[in-house]
């Protein structure tokens, strides 16, 4: 049914490259306006957020390039897999997003797509793109932290 369940959430899809390619500044939860066959396809655990992003057009937030495959039992009522989907946020949240995007060089990136209390939600991040050197620094920092933890584990076991 779903890939994992965390805190009452059934995660359908996650954008694993987003945390690698972007520095996450702030995270929002938004509802997604879907058609019936899209929900059925998501309940089967089929979706991809790779290369997807969100934009703000005329005061509305849209999820673009997210792939939800056609429902296999659907007929002529099936949806288009890569159509633009409206995200449901409060006006105040949209206004703060618009202000922050204008203020700095930020992007809206979906982190995960999940079911919460029977409704489809998307975890949307206000993020800044990382340069190659930033990615290398993060990898070096992670490797150093891993080595420290490994050494502490060895000392705790009395191996050194």
From Swiss-Prot:
Localization (cell): Cytoplasm
Result of knocking out the encoding gene: Not essential for aerobic growth in vitro, has a 20% decrease in tmRNA levels. Increased sensitivity to antibiotics that inhibit translation (chloramphenicol and erythromycin) but not transcription (rifampicin). No change in sensitivity to pyrazinamide (PZA). Unlike smpB, the gene for tmRNA (ssr, 10Sa RNA) is essential. Strains with ssr or smpB disruptions are not more sensitive to pyrazinamide, suggesting the prodrug does not directly target either of these components of trans-translation.
GO cellular component, one term: cytosol
Gene3D superfamilies: 2.40.280.10
Keywords of the record: Cytoplasm, RNA-binding
Pfam families: SmpB
GO MF, any single term: RNA binding
Record keyword Signal present: no
GO biological process: trans-translation
PROSITE patterns in alphabetical order: SSRP
Cystine residue pairs: none
NCBIfam families found in the cross-reference section: PRK05422.1, smpB
Family membership noted in the UniProt record: Belongs to the SmpB family.
The protein's role, per its UniProt record: Required for rescue of stalled ribosomes mediated by trans-translation. Binds to transfer-messenger RNA (tmRNA), required for stable association of tmRNA with ribosomes. tmRNA and SmpB together mimic tRNA shape, replacing the anticodon stem-loop with SmpB. tmRNA is encoded by the ssrA gene; the 2 termini fold to resemble tRNA(Ala) and it encodes a 'tag peptide', a short internal open reading frame. During trans-translation Ala-aminoacylated tmRNA acts like a tRNA, entering the A-site of stalled ribosomes, displacing the stalled mRNA.
Listed name of the protein: SsrA-binding protein
Name of the gene encoding the protein in the UniProt record: smpB
């Amino acid at each position: 049914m779903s890939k994992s369940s965390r805190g009452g959430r059934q995660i359908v899809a996650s954008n694993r490259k987003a945390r690698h390619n972007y520095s996450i500044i702030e995270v929002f939860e938004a509802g997604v306006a879907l058609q019936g066959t899209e929900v059925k396809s998501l309940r089967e655990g089929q979706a991809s957020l790779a290369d997807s992003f969100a934009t703000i057009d005329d005061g509305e937030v849209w999820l673009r390039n997210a792939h939800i495959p056609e429902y296999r039992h659907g007929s002529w009522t099936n949806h288009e897999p890569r159509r633009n989907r409206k995200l449901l946020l409060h006006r105040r949240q949209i206004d703060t997003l618009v202000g922050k995007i204008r203020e700095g060089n930020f992007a809206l990136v979906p982190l995960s797509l999940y079911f919460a209390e029977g409704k489809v939600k998307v975890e949307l991040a206000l993020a800044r793109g990382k340069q190659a050197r930033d990615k290398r620094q993060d990898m070096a920092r992670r490797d150093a932290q891993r080595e420290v933890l490994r050494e502490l584990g060895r000392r705790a076991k009395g191996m050194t």
